[in-house]
Amino acid sequence: MTDSKYFTTNKKGEIFELKAELNNEKKEKRKEAVKKVIAAMTVGKDVSSLFPDVVNCMQTDNLELKKLVYLYLMNYAKSQPDMAIMAVNSFVKDCEDPNPLIRALAVRTMGCIRVDKITEYLCEPLRKCLKDEDPYVRKTAAVCVAKLHDINAQMVEDQGFLDSLRDLIADSNPMVVANAVAALSEISESHPNSNLLDLNPQNINKLLTALNECTEWGQIFILDCLSNYNPKDDREAQSICERVTPRLSHANSAVVLSAVKVLMKFLELLPKESDYYNMLLKKLAPPLVTLLSGEPEVQYVALRNINLIVQKRPEILKQEIKVFFVKYNDPIYVKLEKLDIMIRLASQANIAQVLAELKEYATEVDVDFVRKAVRAIGRCAIKVEQSAERCVSTLLDLIQTKVNYVVQEAIVVIRDIFRKYPNKYESIIATLCENLDSLDEPDARAAMIWIVGEYAERIDNADELLESFLEGFHDESTQVQLTLLTAIVKLFLKKPSETQELVQQVLSLATQDSDNPDLRDRGYIYWRLLSTDPVTAKEVVLSEKPLISEETDLIEPTLLDELICHIGSLASVYHKPPNAFVEGSHGIHRKHLPIHHGSTDAGDSPVGTTTATNLEQPQVIPSQGDLLGDLLNLDLGPPVNVPQVSSMQMGAVDLLGGGLDSLLGSDLGGGIGGSPAVGQSFIPSSVPATFAPSPTPAVVSSGLNDLFELSTGIGMAPGGYVAPKAVWLPAVKAKGLEISGTFTHRQGHIYMEMNFTNKALQHMTDFAIQFNKNSFGVIPSTPLAIHTPLMPNQSIDVSLPLNTLGPVMKMEPLNNLQVAVKNNIDVFYFSCLIPLNVLFVEDGKMERQVFLATWKDIPNENELQFQIKECHLNADTVSSKLQNNNVYTIAKRNVEGQDMLYQSLKLTNGIWILAELRIQPGNPNYTLSLKCRAPEVSQYIYQVYDSILKN
């Protein structure tokens, strides 16, 4: 009889009966009872009251019964930790059982019971099992160490289990080696800078020896570990590749992808002119092709990985394009991936085959697939110049089919072809215009409008065509509205006498009737350009456009290198780095391909080289955490040469001038928009006219954010340093408005505390504020909250919440903030300095090991020393004062009478600063050593230390 009978009972009083059966003297009865308990537990019934009775059943030699009891324990131990202690003695006893299966089962179960109270009892049995004579027990114990580390990392280190794991790498049994490697790899994920695996040529040799005899999953663990190793020279890299290459013919696709990952990384170290390099490239193709004969799901994963490989090394699969031709029964997700790879492999040699395939795909029934096929024809035209004419001809044939979505997609790609090959295929415009009425998608309408505007001089009725789009202007998408505005301005510049009324109509619609700030601003820019200098307008709007690139959807090179290091994992399927989708992944070690260094001796540690590579390859599209680091590595000047203006504290950058009325809803300079002639009077007198047509969008914060910001308490952290208020904008420079202020950090939020004083003879209203781009992306979270008029001689205090989600630009000095304030009188500009302590975040405390590894990892030339003079505080007071400002003391030592404080802090943009503060009792001068990856920040951190400790 099957076990399904255990799931069918619905009797009342079942728990009482089970309790009696669990205490029955007959083994078979007890076993049946435990099965019923497990069945009840499986369907969601609460059988926790039977805990003591089930635990009593542990005392048995029957392996099946033991497994069932252990399953029950794992499920209920967390909710009944005190009861779980009852089972400890049985576990310890089972760990010494003569049967190795029972020993392994006991140690595995103890590792799965995530209860702190039990972990301390687990140490002794685990230590014995790690040295057990049976390899099955040792391999199980190795995994248990990783589980224990997840519960209590400190205990694992204190008990020396990490050393025991390292010893297992030299074990005679390959599965023990594989599990030890897997456990160490997982532990090192949470300690990215600690060289736990200690990869050196001797250990690598042991791993390669074990590789041949492992199970398939053991091989994956070992291959993933090998991919983190950086060989000393190309000879060692070649030797490893030779021993890994046989894995390419493995039946398990995961093993194949792990082997491909190792070889792709080590290819970077091999000289490109060598015979072995070319032979290895040839060997990589067949296994990748074989992966495409599996299940659709396996094919999809393989194709996503192949997409990365083709972007990195297209020569591997350049002869295999036919493999990626779509089969009629492929699922849509496989079809789309194959199509993408086909385009990447398209070349002059195979373009005829590719185009024939694509034309066939464009007649299929699946709309998404057809769209992508039509788009692919356009990409072929752009990528392979010799095929452009044939591609255009194919697209025209498809347009003649009059299938709506095919026509629309074809028009979108023809626009790109016009951009790539100007003045070459414009003869087809007439055919395109015939299909104008059938266009209903924003992309297609925008593409057609762009074509009409760009080639208006060749189209007799261009004004009529654009006017037809203008009739439903407010119903169009933003993309179409912006394109139509630009197209009509182009038309006006080419045929001014015939289209004056049309351009005034579109400018009026864009600036007066639209709620979209982007559209309004572009309208004002064109309006001012046309009214002040039509010649310049022509040069700007009708300027020669840069040619579009061949591949617009390539993954950015640094990210591609990182994804190559994650072949075979979820990152390679998402095409995103792990830290983009793994929760709490800030500690995940970012991987990069090794740099070819010939035969020089670079350290064996994968950590050192990886970090160096990370520094040398700043991200092109940085995450918020890396923005400043990348800016500091680049020699960025200001974007424009700003002339100094004597009446201001800084070079006048037009933060608000170009579109303040439209952005903030007020009228400066008397009714802008009524006539282009008044455009010039809109520019503040202190701002050079050069900057007028460059408005910065106003910060629009959501109502929800506003509620959160306003709900934060006023109370500050005890002892948190606040710089005294300074006058930022004197009344003499702001027509009677005086602004003084400072910055504070309280309850995890940054505030700009300001005092507005009206020293003029008239009241002030309509206040608004905006920041220029700055080094830390600081912007207001909410609009300026001054809701009542500021009367003469009246003052008002304002607390403005800030965040660091704005655009970033390196300033000089680094903490400089340029501010524009507008009221009913004028727009005023001032600059102030942000004390960096308000940018210190609460999670700036590093673990000791991470601190030590990071300190060693940062180059010595990044270390800067400063003297803090005339400070009479002891080490504890210093530590306490700094902690109130989110500077955390990691460790304190006394060396030869000197107190040494080791501290860490973190800025809002993710930059870590490590500090060593030396305090000599009786000596009022302290020595501060600072280390960080962006040493330009250190000077400002020192200033903050000085201010905090002296106030």
UniProtKB/Swiss-Prot annotation:
| Cell division in keyword set | no
Q: What cystine linkages occur within this chain?
A: none
Q: Name one GO biological process term.
A: coronary vasculature development
Q: Where would you say this protein principally sits, based on its record?
A: membrane
Membrane-protein topology: Peripheral membrane protein
The source's domain of life comes to Eukaryota
Q: Which residues, renumbered to this chain, carry the PTM N6-acetyllysine?
A: 318
Organism of derivation: Bos taurus
Q: What is this protein called?
A: AP-1 complex subunit beta-1
Q: Which family does it belong to?
A: Belongs to the adaptor complexes large subunit family.
How would you summarize the oligomeric state and partners of this protein?
A: Adaptor protein complex 1 (AP-1) is a heterotetramer composed of two large adaptins (gamma-type subunit AP1G1 and beta-type subunit AP1B1), a medium adaptin (mu-type subunit AP1M1 or AP1M2) and a small adaptin (sigma-type subunit AP1S1 or AP1S2 or AP1S3).
Keyword check for Lipid biosynthesis, yes or no.
no
Tell me where in or outside the cell this protein is found: Cytoplasmic vesicle, Clathrin-coated vesicle membrane; Golgi apparatus
Matching InterPro entries, A to Z? Answer: AP_beta, AP_complex_bsu_1_2_4, ARM-like, ARM-type_fold, Armadillo, B-adaptin_app_sub_C, Clathrin/coatomer_adapt-like_N, Clathrin_a/b/g-adaptin_app_Ig
Q: What is the lineage of its organism?
A: Eukaryota, Metazoa, Chordata, Craniata, Vertebrata
Cited PANTHER family: ADAPTOR COMPLEX SUBUNIT BETA FAMILY MEMBER (PTHR11134)
Entry keyword set: Acetylation, Cytoplasmic vesicle, Golgi apparatus, Membrane, Nitration, Protein transport, Transport
Which one of the record's GO molecular function terms can you name? clathrin binding
**Any idea which residues bear 3'-nitrotyrosine here?**
574
Give an example GO cellular component term for this record: presynapse
Q: What does this protein do?
A: Subunit of clathrin-associated adaptor protein complex 1 that plays a role in protein sorting in the late-Golgi/trans-Golgi network (TGN) and/or endosomes. The AP complexes mediate both the recruitment of clathrin to membranes and the recognition of sorting signals within the cytosolic tails of transmembrane cargo molecules.
